[in-house]
Amino acid sequence: MSALNWKPFVYGGLASITAECGTFPIDLTKTRLQIQGQTNDAKFKEIRYRGMLHALVRIGREEGLKALYSGIAPAMLRQSSYGTIKIGTYQSLKRLFVERPEDETLLINVICGILSGVISSTIANPTDVLKIRMQAQSSTIQGGMIGNFMNIYQQEGTRGLWKGVSLTAQRAAIVVGVELPVYDITKKHLILSGLMGDTVYTHFLSSFTCGLAGALASNPVDVVRTRMMNQRVLQDGRCSGYTGTLDCLLQTWKNEGFFALYKGFWPNWLRLGPWNIILFVTYEQLKKLDL
């Protein structure tokens, strides 16, 4: 086996940060849509937004354009850890199974994607909790990233920073286990078929396809994960929140219907599409650098 290659880690992190900055307002509207309408939390019971565009306009009008980037600092911190580990681990694990990219199979890529998703998301979970908490705030964020981080730690302890970690790992296993293999297989077949070469157009089409596949597979888990992470330690006895991820799933389905699990799907897909396009196009261009 060849020595561990550092390039996928660095390139993956840089490409992930670039993609995050380019699509963050869409991600914020997704979070706001997913946390609204919760009958067991008075703060988020009201249906404030009718959809993604309405959320973008209303947030910008009522809270200012700066609010569309609420939580960008922990999001970039998350991608610098999660994105770096995810891409680097995925590429490294593949080389453990096969030496040449041409010998990769769908099964190998899925296994490597699932493992890299679980590992990277578990390590980066505190930054994910922080990002969602800051995105959910509908007023000026107080204390900044460090202040919010300390607030979560002081009120909820270490467990608060890893709240929803099992669901985050499950979601990452689904997303990474779908997106990265779909990208690789789509790109491989487009090139081998002779329809397209190894060009930016191939990278564009492959990344768009994997974004759609990832959104369809992950949205229900994403809704539950977002609600679990946004749930605070409540003092009101009538507002007990969710006892666990399964309880959150069942309550959401029972109180709001099955399609509540696909709340935020359009901003989720419209984010994952451009996000993956920016990610993979940037990553492929970085790979061409002679370093």
From Swiss-Prot:
Alphabetical list of InterPro entries matching this protein: Mit_carrier (IPR002067), Mito_Metabolite_Transporter (IPR050391), Mitochondrial_sb/sol_carrier (IPR018108), Mt_carrier_dom_sf (IPR023395)
PTM-bearing positions, type N-acetylserine: S2
Membrane topology: Multi-pass membrane protein
Localization per record: Mitochondrion inner membrane
Record's catalysed reaction(s): sulfite(in) + sulfate(out) = sulfite(out) + sulfate(in); thiosulfate(in) + sulfate(out) = thiosulfate(out) + sulfate(in); sulfate(out) + phosphate(in) = sulfate(in) + phosphate(out); oxalate(in) + sulfate(out) = oxalate(out) + sulfate(in)
Predominant cellular place of this UniProt entry's protein: mitochondrion
Keyword Glycoprotein recorded: no
Solcar repeats, residue ranges: 7-96, 104-189, 198-289
Family matches, as Pfam families: Mito_carr
One of the GO biological process terms: inorganic anion transport
Keywords for this protein: Acetylation, Membrane, Mitochondrion, Mitochondrion inner membrane, Repeat, Transmembrane, Transmembrane helix, Transport
One GO cellular component, as annotated: mitochondrial inner membrane
Keyword NAD: no
Membrane-spanning residues: 9-26, 71-89, 106-124, 164-183, 203-221, 265-283
Gene3D superfamilies hit by this protein: Mitochondrial carrier domain
Gene Ontology molecular function terms on file: solute:inorganic anion antiporter activity
Assembly and interaction partners: Interacts with VDAC1.
Entry similarity comment: Belongs to the mitochondrial carrier (TC 2.A.29) family.
Its biological purpose: Antiporter that transports inorganic anions (sulfate, sulfite, thiosulfate and phosphate) and, to a lesser extent, a variety of dicarboxylates (e.g. malonate, malate and citramalate) and, even more so, aspartate. The sulfate/sulfate exchange is much higher than the phosphate/phosphate and malate/malate exchanges. The transport affinities is higher for sulfate and thiosulfate than for any other substrate. May catalyze the export of sulfite and thiosulfate (the hydrogen sulfide degradation products) from the mitochondria, thereby modulating the level of the hydrogen sulfide.
PANTHER family per UniProt: MITOCHONDRIAL DICARBOXYLATE CARRIER-RELATED (PTHR45618)
UniProt-recorded name of the protein: Kidney mitochondrial carrier protein 1
Source species of the chain: Macaca fascicularis
